[in-house]
Design a protein with these regions (language model features):
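Hydrophobic core segments within long, regular secondary-structure runs in both alpha-
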Residues: 1-12, 40, 58-69, 111, ...
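Low-complexity, Ser/Thr/Pro/Gly-enriched N-terminal "stalk/linker" regions
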Residues: 1-31, 75-78, 82-83, 177
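Surface-exposed patches in mature extracellular/periplasmic domains of secreted proteins
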Residues: 19-24, 51-57, 123-130, 186
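A generic secondary-structure boundary signal that marks alpha-helix termini
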Residues: 13, 48-51, 70, 119, ...
Length: 196
């Protein structure tokens, strides 16, 4: 329990009360959807281990979901790859204002944790549904279940297949939990084996 309490201190120290977001890196006010999903995992664990009480959990969850529901999306589609944790604004990887694309893998991880929270704490179901229903997945997954991320090239969005063995299947699981067909992204093939 001591280790869990010590680990939770990271999320206490790096919590931004203006947005309910947590810095992905110690004392650096930026985060991704992947890192924000990690915060949801930590928040859930802290609550279920009794490190924080229901009131603290609710305060943090309500603020986080309120911010998630109002984030300005990349091209009005999906969350940008990075956000400033103090302002909640879209940023690039140097934490300067702007948009840089979206990661289907990061969003897939967020979808996993939104589903877990919704199932374990149904009182947050409406807020979570509002988040997911506000996202436009049309460029993130195709009818065959292939995941696509986005980046900007000369100011125009480019959508490219996104995934690596393990990460892609994990991201696909998040989409699958919300009813998407992920047959292509859920399959580890093609891959090759090497003799060692």
């Amino acid at each position: 329990m001591t280790i869990a309490k010590n680990a939770w201190q990271y999320f206490v120290t790096n919590y931004q009360p203006t947005t309910g977001l947590v810095n992905a890196v110690n004392k650096y006010p930026s985060t991704t959807m992947w890192d924000s999903a990690s915060y949801l995992a930590a928040l859930t664990a802290a609550r279920e281990l009794g490190i924080i009480d229901k009131a603290e959990f609710d305060r943090r969850m309500l603020k986080f979901l309120a911010t998630l529901n109002t984030l300005v999306l990349f091209r009005n589609e999906l969350p940008n790859k990075a956000y400033n944790t103090i302002s909640g604004q879209k940023v690039d990887y140097t934490n300067k204002p702007g948009e840089i694309g979206f990661s289907a893998l990061d969003i897939g991880r967020m979808l996993v944790w939104l589903k877990i929270i919704k199932e374990r704490y149904p009182e947050y179901g409406n807020s979570i549904d509002n988040v997911v229903l506000g996202w436009d997945f049309s460029h993130a997954i195709d009818p065959c279940g292939t995941l696509y991320g986005a980046y900007l090239e000369n100011g125009q969005p480019k959508y490219v297949q996104e995934g690596r063995l393990g990460y892609e299947e994990y991201g696909a699981a998040g989409f699958q939990l919300w009813g998407f067909n992920t047959c292509k992204a859920s399959s580890p093939q093609p891959y090759e084996l090497a003799e060692i």
